[in-house]
Amino acid sequence: MEKNPPDDTGPVHVPLGHIVANEKWRGSQLAQEMQGKIKLIFEDGLTPDFYLSNRCCILYVTEADLVAGNGYRKRLVRVRNSNNLKGIVVVEKTRMSEQYFPALQKFTVLDLGMVLLPVASQMEASCLVIQLVQEQTKEPSKNPLLGKKRALLLSEPSLLRTVQQIPGVGKVKAPLLLQKFPSIQQLSNASIGELEQVVGQAVAQQIHAFFTQPR
């Protein structure tokens, strides 16, 4: 996997309703959870972990990747710098990896401007990936990954659950925030003043600190 071809972030043909998966995921729990619900095509030499379409991919950061250090960053940067791809970063946020999450969050959301979705396990990740593929089968104008106005579809349930985890937000305020800021990227870039209009000053400061202050 070290000697990737120069065009390994280029467009890959993905049949409708399929996922093209990096060969390294063959036999994994994540792949097994998806098989039977979605059709997987395994290919070697890919920088992304999964292609949802020829121009939309998932970069998966495992608990082990996060604990091991910053080795995952090179892959994220390659996809971010590619003109061919829109990348979504999915990360395993567990008790073991939680302390490393803020650094990943800052790098992914603030430095690279990419969407970051934490999951608790590969089983939860499989549900998220399947949901994203189902959205890909819709016409492009209704695809939440291609249109900001439809981004709220992604919040059922994965993005919504992610926002609920932000200190001070909870189940009541999360939907209100997502109506005004329908993606993690938009929410993380919001000013305290903009957030105050939705959730009040105290919670706005908590949200802003969550995204901007590394722990």
Curated annotation (Swiss-Prot):
GO molecular function: chromatin binding; DNA binding
Annotated coiled-coil segments of the chain: none
InterPro entries to which the protein is assigned, alphabetical: DisA/LigA_HHH (IPR041663), FAAP24 (IPR026985), PND (IPR040646), RuvA_2-like (IPR010994)
Segments of this protein annotated with the region RuvA domain 2-like: 160-215
Signal peptide interval: none
Keywords, alphabetical: DNA damage, DNA repair, DNA-binding, Nucleus
GO cellular component: chromatin; cytosol; FANCM-MHF complex; Fanconi anaemia nuclear complex; intracellular membrane-bounded organelle; nucleoplasm
Keyword Nucleus in annotation: yes
Protein's GO biological process: interstrand cross-link repair
Keyword presence, Membrane: no
Localization of this protein: Nucleus
Assembly with partners or alone: Belongs to the multisubunit FA complex composed of FANCA, FANCB, FANCC, FANCE, FANCF, FANCG, FANCL/PHF9, FANCM and FAAP24. Interacts with FANCM.
Free-text comment on this protein's domains from its UniProt entry: The C-terminal region is distantly related to RuvA domain 2, a DNA-binding domain.
Functional summary from the UniProt entry: Plays a role in DNA repair through recruitment of the FA core complex to damaged DNA. Regulates FANCD2 monoubiquitination upon DNA damage. Induces chromosomal instability as well as hypersensitivity to DNA cross-linking agents, when repressed. Targets FANCM/FAAP24 complex to the DNA, preferentially to single strand DNA.
Protein name (database record): Fanconi anemia core complex-associated protein 24
Organism: Homo sapiens
